[in-house]
Amino acid sequence: MDLGLSGKKAIVCAASKGLGRAVALALAREGVDLVINARSQDALKATAGQISGKTGVNVIPIAADITTEEGRQAVLAACPNPNILINNAGGPPPGDFRQVTRQDWIRAADANMLTPIFLIRAVVDGMVERGFGRIINITTSGVKAPGVYPQLGISIGVRSGLTGFVGVLSRQVARRNVTINGLLPGRFDTDRLRENLVFAAKAAGHSSEQEAILARGAIPAGRFGQPEEFGAFAAFLCSTHAGFLTGQNIVLDGGAYPGLL
């Protein structure tokens, strides 16, 4: 299927590895030129070279802290008029909220709620004027099923704030073929998953290998998701075929979410 994205431009945050990298690669395979961002310059440059080598598209790596105004301006200067924005950021570390300081909460809100909102604010009006835009916020399936991740209360809390904001804005720009959706990953085979498994294993008093077995057993698909699967779905959500889908929070978790809605 031709996704109708060839020649378009995208900003992809936290794209040096994991789900962000998978989304960037999937978009590049559809002919999308990229500006990718992460903090680590070496890893980001390596990813840019790999994606460009595989797909032939233009990939500009901008190593910067996207949670700062300077970092956001650097990314936007490299791609001032994106057709696609992929908001993505690593969540705060797992833990008991009783041990979390006020500054920890502020950092989490800045990274996982305010930064995506500021990036959306910077690009959405241009998308409206051009009559095409796709914005995806990569959050967590915990937004819909918080009880599954008791150690991620901070992450779920601030990402839920972003989700509420998008629920309002997405309806305001839909008439101009600008969609804003949340992709809510469950357990995908990434570094972040492995960190969470180690934390959960320590809390439960068993090995991370045993924790991984238990985690897979809670997924009807019987396995962890692969980043490539996530990237392919995100690319479709950015496509010209997905213009009637907006304001939604779509869970990709192998069937683990127990609800109907």
Where on the chain are the PLM-derived regions?
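Conserved NAD(P)H cofactor-binding loop of Rossmann-fold oxidoreductase domains
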Residues: N88-P94, G255
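A short, exposed helix-loop element centered on a Lys and neighboring polar residues
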Residues: I120-R121, G167
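Short C-terminal tail/terminal secondary-structure segment
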Residues: L3, G18, A235, T246-L261
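Substrate-binding pocket helix/loop in short-chain dehydrogenase/reductase
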Residues: D96-F97, D104-A109, A215-R216
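Short, small/polar-rich loop/turn modules that mediate ligand/substrate recognition or access, typified
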Residues: A174, T179, L245-G247
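Canonical Rossmann dinucleotide-binding motif of NAD(H)/NADP(H)-dependent dehydrogenases/reductases
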Residues: L3-D33
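Catalytic loop of short-chain dehydrogenase/reductase
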Residues: I136-L162, V166-R175, R187
